[in-house]
Amino acid sequence: MAIPEVMDTGAASVEIPFSGLETEPILKLDYAAGVQTKLCDIDLSRQIPVAIMQHGDTVEYFWDSEGGTVFAHTAIRPDGSVEEQTVPRKFYPNLYDEYAAYDIWGTACKRLDWQTGELTTASLPFVQLDSVLGAVGSRVLLTRIVSDTPLPEGEGHEDMRDAVLQNSLREYDLYDPATNTIEKVFDEPYYPEDHNESKSYLGYCGDKLYFGVSHTDGVSALSRKNTLVSYDRTAGIWQEECSADAQNGEDSGFWPFLQDGRLKLVVLWRGKDTLTLYSIDNGARYEVPYEEAGSDATGNRNFPIALTDDGRILVTDGYIDRSGVAASRYALIDLGAYLAGSREYTAVEMWTE
């Protein structure tokens, strides 16, 4: 069973269990109280979840309908009241702050104001947007394709498009939605020189941007080594922070953990029964035992889920039965103790039907 993703604020986390039912709850876990409660139910027979966001104490659940005929968001207030509001145009938010939600894609930045509900659109000051990576303070890190000729669009032009990309750059920029301006950070060849290497953005801390680099064996496409690297925006310098090699033939991705929007902890490697973690704060590497989640609702212990504002970490702690469906149970533990290998948890009081 997959480890669930949660929308985390440092004080609480919000999640949709996705247990395969037509009606699912939206659950909130208050870290200080150590209690999980239900905010409301959502109807997945008519809603396709898009995103969960939060401003102040209000949780916003964005969704659209089958076929994309309706775009809406459900505001869940701290008093338990729920208000459904439609959005007049296609809106798939990929970022948010305390003022608005943003849908940055194609040639436009759409902004939905939390206070007024007004949806505005600004044309982006560049072309050939490649990806939106995440917030860096009040700005957005994104990539765009820089080429001598425009990229061919539409079906049937795949070979021509690939030929253009072979001689193009991927430029990393910081975009400011408030001023609609960009600042170049760095660029690199669109296709890496080493075709057995792939790079993914994990987060930022201070002036450094952090990336996970996976090295495959070129045959099975499985990662054989994961390396955490950083780029110092002020000095313009790349640095290798830490790396982890495969053992016993396993494959692993990266799991970044943020606090106040900044990268604090990274799972470099997920082995059969051990996690390799790296702390951004002190530059130390840790080996922490855990139990994989089994298809028969066994295991699922000690895998990190989120960091809390009070110096603890939320981890998996087995399963609970929720209306006949196995759901992850959570526990809280001091971060330092967790990294030292302790399992002296404080159990979370989980919501059940």
Model-derived features: positions:
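The feature marks helicase ATPase cores and/or their adjacent C-terminal helical subdomains
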Residues: 8-10, 86, 99-100, 163
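N-terminal low-complexity, Pro/Thr/Ser-rich intrinsically disordered segments
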Residues: 6-9, 17-21
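Generic structural signal for coil-to-beta-strand starts
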Residues: 59, 81, 100, 140, ...
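Acidic/polar residues in short coil/turn loops that connect beta-strands
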Residues: 9, 33, 55-56, 67, ...
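Repeated scaffold domains used in trafficking and secretory/extracellular systems
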Residues: 3-6, 45-55, 87-98, 126-137, ...
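Residue position within the beta-strands of beta-propeller blades
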Residues: 2, 13-16, 61-63, 102-103, ...
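Surface-exposed loop/turn elements that mediate protein-protein interactions on large endomembrane-trafficking
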Residues: 20-44, 65-87, 106-126, 156-190, ...
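Solenoidal tandem-repeat scaffolds enriched in leucines and small polar residues
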Residues: 133-136, 141-156, 160-172
